[in-house]
């Protein structure tokens, strides 16, 4: 993987670049649709390519390990061969899911024992077998296995957790370097900065990771209940230290406003389930604000869903989408998901254009309040 920094904004830390992988290029800043189990919920790959304009999607190691399982994925030639997506893929290590979805778990130095949320079966993740699992899945970008402490952890627990994450990272890197890709294309490993909301721990984590010389670096453990201003402060603290010549990935974030604020602070890559999850619940994001398509006000509004949006937005009307949600038709969730994902990709594409033009901050400030309004 190679990252080329192309433009930097004079008034902020915003920047544009290009990530080159063996499955294609990724223009940054970029939003990555989440395909937890190998698919983006409710959206066909054709629509992801042609309407959403997705350049890279995510898979999740925890979920793919449980279903369809490693034997199937290996026999298929990895996730690319299994699902037919020909562009880049990134896999999360499953750490967040192990520490959030599984109610019964035992954490120790070697790794984490947990029970499947599907059938209660017992499993054990270590840095080594997670690296092996991500090799089998075969994503272009692999995430290190880390401990994900609760967002409001006290300082002593956060410090202890960070120490564990750092030791696990060393083991991840060792295993990654000892193994080879399985399917004839290169893979990259991204470490993850943890440290909760403690500046000194975030700085320590960022310095530890910066010294590793990885192809890119991630910021984890944010957007888990802390105030947004605290999240932005943590991003600033970390990005002062992470190398500028490597892509920076803010995991699990967030709202359109969050993304623009993080771009201003030097973040390049984003993922979040919000566009599809909110879409399935009739909430649409637009430059004018958010729309609840179940509201009666849309009942006789025959204008396009978004006159500046993708093809789906132009084909269907607000009244029709309102009707579909009221009738509980599956098409409603599909249309809303396509719209929201296309909007998120348009947002980061527009941000990229304004960084290149040199007016990113002015543009961001002119739209950010409107983005959060309810229409």
Name the predicted role of every residue range.
Residues 1-182, 296:
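Non-catalytic, usually N-terminal nucleic-acid engagement modules in DNA/RNA processing proteins
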Residues 1-20, 26-33, 41-42, 146-152, ...:
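C-terminal extensions of enzymes
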């Amino acid at each position: 993987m190679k990252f080329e920094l192309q433009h930097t904004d004079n008034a902020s830390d915003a920047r544009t670049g290009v990530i080159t992988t063996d499955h294609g290029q990724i223009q940054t800043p970029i939003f990555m649709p989440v395909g937890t189990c190998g698919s983006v919920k409710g959206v066909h790959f054709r629509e992801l390519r042609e309407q959403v304009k997705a350049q890279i999607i995510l898979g999740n190691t925890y979920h793919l390990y449980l279903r369809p399982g490693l034997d199937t994925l290996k026999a298929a030639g990895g996730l690319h061969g299994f699902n037919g997506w020909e562009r880049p893929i990134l896999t999360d290590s499953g750490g967040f899911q192990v520490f959030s979805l599984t109610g019964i778990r035992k954490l120790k130095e070697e790794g984490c024992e947990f029970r499947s949320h599907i059938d209660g079966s017992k499993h054990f993740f270590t840095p080594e077998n997670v690296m092996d699992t991500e090799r089998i899945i075969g994503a272009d970008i692999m995430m290190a296995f880390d401990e994900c402490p609760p967002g409001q952890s006290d300082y002593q627990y956060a410090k202890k957790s960070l120490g564990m994450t750092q030791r696990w990272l060393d083991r991840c890197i060792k295993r990654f370097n000892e193994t080879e890709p399985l399917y004839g294309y290169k893979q990259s490993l991204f470490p993850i900065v943890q440290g909760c909301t403690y500046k000194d721990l975030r700085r320590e984590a960022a310095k530890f990771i910066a010294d590793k010389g990885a192809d890119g670096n991630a910021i984890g453990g944010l957007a888990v209940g802390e105030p947004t201003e605290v999240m932005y402060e943590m991003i600033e603290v970390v990005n002062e230290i992470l190398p500028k010549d490597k892509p920076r990935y803010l995991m699990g974030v967030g709202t359109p406003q969050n993304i623009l604020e993080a771009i201003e602070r030097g973040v390049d890559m984003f993922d979040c389930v919000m566009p599809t999850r909110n879409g399935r619940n009739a909430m649409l994001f637009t430059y004018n604000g958010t729309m609840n398509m179940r509201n009666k006000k849309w009942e006789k509004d025959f204008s396009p869903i978004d006159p500046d949006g993708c093809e789906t937005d132009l084909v269907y009307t607000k009244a029709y989408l309102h009707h579909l949600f009221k009738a509980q038709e599956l098409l409603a969730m599909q249309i809303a998901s396509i719209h929201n994902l296309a909007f998120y990709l348009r947002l980061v594409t527009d941000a990229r254009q304004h960084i290149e033009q040199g007016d990113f901050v002015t543009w961001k400030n002119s739209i950010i309040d409107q983005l959060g309004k309810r229409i």
